[in-house]
Amino acid sequence: MVKVGVNGFGRIGRLVTRAAFNSGKVDVVAINDPFIDLHYMVYMFQYDSTHGKFHGTVKAENGKLVINGKAITIFQERDPANIKWGDAGAEYVVESTGVFTTMEKAGAHLKGGAKRVIISAPSADAPMFVMGVNHEKYDNSLKIVSNASCTTNCLAPLAKVIHDHFGIVEGLMTTVHAITATQKTVDGPSGKLWRDGRGAAQNIIPASTGAAKAVGKVIPELNGKLTGMAFRVPTPNVSVVDLTCRLEKAAKYDDIKKVVKQASEGPLKGILGYTEDQVVSCDFNSATHSSTFDAGAGIALNDHFVKLISWYDNEFGYSNRVVDLMVHMASKE
């Protein structure tokens, strides 16, 4: 089982750790966070406003974080180059601070003895992988990879199924996205992105997202055919993608439902879900799929122009894919 270090114990860092313990697929051996001391880590890991209390034991003992009886080494370094991952036995590092997202910055982890780095965010220059879409293209020569964004992980599996069966001529995506840590509780300064600085709980905020264009990186045939934007809305978690696209081959909406359902039960099982229930966002809290197609919410204008809806837990679904990507990478060692 691959031994993992986590850099940054924020929403994704903590949930990747939860996903690792829930699945038992990877072994978390070290965590680095300069801003959270050990006893605070115990508290933050145990209690979660969104996903509820951790079902297991967590305590501080002999300077280590002990989860379900397993002792985890704690570092508090600000500079990734100074983290002694090798000493703790960490082979792979999940870079989840949101700060070190380039090859150069994430590469600093390799200096401390890590063998590979998985950036839990989109990256300007690191190769991006989406489980179920292009993970097979990963090869051992790559030391630093990106797991793309939660939204790309929702959109890409759906886009792949649709494109493989009917061909996507072009498409626009909107994600109606839950609040994240980068937003403000009340109006405040936000650099050049003025709207992003408005109160998160009070507003629907139009925002940019690179998620749709990033699909073109993981599915090269769709490069230049998709773009999109986001609306940030006042919900704490769970987001939904609206993909409106023009199809090359004529398809009835029932045909689309059929192929998505088949994919959800076959090659994309566990990644792409399918539901015909009358669901709302809360129903996907703590869901582990990357994307769940909402058969009842989509509409077709005609046989070539459709609007497709897919839900995702932008925190926990994504965190589970980070774990899955590491398992896949380890299988290639």
From Swiss-Prot:
Q: Location of the Glycyl lysine isopeptide (Lys-Gly) (interchain with G-Cter in SUMO2) covalent cross-link?
A: 184
What EC number(s) would the UniProt record show?
1.2.1.12, 2.6.99.-
Q: Which UniProt keywords apply?
A: Acetylation, ADP-ribosylation, Apoptosis, Cytoplasm, Cytoskeleton, Glycolysis, Immunity, Innate immunity, Isopeptide bond, Methylation, NAD, Nucleus, Oxidoreductase, Phosphoprotein, S-nitrosylation, Transferase, Translation regulation, Ubl conjugation
Residues that the record marks as modified (ADP-ribosylcysteine) are: 150
CDD domains according to UniProt: GAPDH_I_C, GAPDH_I_N
**Motif range ([IL]-x-C-x-x-[DE] motif):** 243-248
Modified positions (N6-malonyllysine) are: 192, 213
Q: Which GO terms describe its cellular component?
A: cytoplasm; cytosol; GAIT complex; microtubule cytoskeleton; nucleus
Reproduce the UniProt comment on modification after translation: ISGylated. S-nitrosylation of Cys-150 leads to interaction with SIAH1, followed by translocation to the nucleus S-nitrosylation of Cys-245 is induced by interferon-gamma and LDL(ox) implicating the iNOS-S100A8/9 transnitrosylase complex and seems to prevent interaction with phosphorylated RPL13A and to interfere with GAIT complex activity.
**Positions modified as Phosphoserine?**
120, 146, 149, 239, 310, 331
Q: What is its main location?
A: cytoplasm
Listed under catalytic activity are:
D-glyceraldehyde 3-phosphate + phosphate + NAD(+) = (2R)-3-phospho-glyceroyl phosphate + NADH + H(+); S-nitroso-L-cysteinyl-[GAPDH] + L-cysteinyl-[protein] = L-cysteinyl-[GAPDH] + S-nitroso-L-cysteinyl-[protein]
Entry note about domains: The [IL]-x-C-x-x-[DE] motif is a proposed target motif for cysteine S-nitrosylation mediated by the iNOS-S100A8/A9 transnitrosylase complex.
For this chain, the family text in UniProt reads:
Belongs to the glyceraldehyde-3-phosphate dehydrogenase family.
Q: What is this protein called?
A: Glyceraldehyde-3-phosphate dehydrogenase
For this protein's source organism, the top of the classification is: Eukaryota, Metazoa, Chordata, Craniata, Vertebrata
Originating gene: GAPDH
